[in-house]
Amino acid sequence: MAILRLENGTTYTQLADISLELAKLNVTLNYWPIENEATRQLLKQASLTDEEKEIVLTSLDGYFEQLKQEAGYQARDLIVLHPEIANLDTLLAKFERCHTHADDEVRYIIDGEGVFGFVFADGSQGELTIQPQEYINVPAHSEHWFHLTASKRVKAVRYFTSTAGWVPEYTETVIRFPSLTAV
């Protein structure tokens, strides 16, 4: 289950409490179960071939269809990150800085875990660890960052209305959250 840690030391582990805090940012967090047993078995593998990725994506297309109808999403892909990927730290570095996007950042974590950091309207910061079967929508222009946990493993479906709006626009905000340096 998701864990929200605020800069002031407060930690939330209940979805209702987390949702109340995230509502201040218009961030949406949902639980989307993975019911297909074959998909769950594929997700146990550290890496996936392109064919296996497509099998996983197809098995989860019910969620994609919902997003297409409700919000006009047009594309999705599956990103698989693990420690054996060459230059993983270099790849992740561009997301570990505070940035925004012109479009929503929508992720469905299906294996592993990742951490989204946020800057609240009052300037305070928080980090949300999201785990398998959790879906997050970070609204366009929300100041945030992303990093992996110490396991450095995640499989996430990324949803796009267009890929053009997903280019990071870096801000000068200093991340004060201590966990980024600990990873």
UniProtKB/Swiss-Prot annotation:
Pathway: Amino-acid biosynthesis; L-methionine biosynthesis via salvage pathway; L-methionine from S-methyl-5-thio-alpha-D-ribose 1-phosphate: step 5/6
Family: Belongs to the acireductone dioxygenase (ARD) family.
GO MF: acireductone dioxygenase (Ni2+-requiring) activity; acireductone dioxygenase [iron(II)-requiring] activity; iron ion binding; nickel cation binding
Record's keyword terms, sorted: Amino-acid biosynthesis, Dioxygenase, Iron, Metal-binding, Methionine biosynthesis, Nickel, Oxidoreductase
Cofactor note (record): Binds 1 Fe(2+) cation per monomer.
InterPro entries linked: ARD (IPR004313), ARD_bac (IPR023956), RmlC-like_jellyroll (IPR014710), RmlC_Cupin_sf (IPR011051)
The name this protein goes by in its record: Acireductone dioxygenase
CDD domains assigned: cupin_ARD
Cofactor(s) recorded in Swiss-Prot or TrEMBL: Fe(2+); Ni(2+)
Top-level taxonomic group: Bacteria
